[in-house]
């Protein structure tokens, strides 16, 4: 039995909305292009979270060309993807930073991406490590962002002016420090499909090796061939805040 058979069986039960979010554009460009080529060949959309502080001319040119061709959506991934917390879990926009401190980095990143990509950049924000604070949400709302994309296990934030579209399955997910097996990953995906909620799959191209690319390609083949797959950009799944 194929390791993806649980996913195929779950799709047989009914329609499923699914999106892919790839984080950390700015690191590992060649692997990024390889991932985007996989999606292009399957005619499936992908949202790319771009680190403003890691922009280069070649990254800008490559992403802009692919976004203009269709299927690739671009949005902001923090500012520099650095940890500012003195201890504990990693945050770029964490509890040790005030509204004003966070606003400086978010608006600087926003300006860099707008200068680089113009209207190809969507009003979506993914915080590094999927973590941020209520101050972050307030900054986003005050600076024109419409959507925050974290992880589905993240605690709700107070500011309802920004819609949340979380990822639900981490391709590199683990339990107690041990990476899921392919069959465990397939079961996680199948459970997400059966939930009736949109399925958001988080990828990290920079740590994706040839074997992982082959596995992602196999999943895309299953999704692309199944009539119940409703592949969509992240932004299309946002509810209107308020």
Residue positions per predicted region:
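C-terminal domain-boundary segment and adjacent tail
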Residues: 2-13, 147-148, 200, 205-242
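Alpha-helical scaffold elements lining the catalytic groove of polysaccharide deacetylases
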Residues: 2, 84-115, 156-194
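Metal-dependent polysaccharide deacetylase catalytic core of the NodB/CE4 family, i.e.
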Residues: 45-138, 169
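Acidic, His- and aromatic-enriched active-site or binding-groove loops in soluble protein domains
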Residues: 73, 139-156
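A cross-family glycoside hydrolase active-site/sugar-binding cleft signature
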Residues: 19-23, 47-51, 75-77, 125-126, ...
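Acidic-and-aromatic substrate-binding clefts and catalytic sites of carbohydrate-active enzymes
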Residues: 24-30, 49-61, 126-135, 156, ...
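Active-site beta->alpha N-cap acidic-glycine motif
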Residues: 1-73, 121-122, 201
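Short, electropositive alpha-helical surface patch
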Residues: 132-146, 218-220
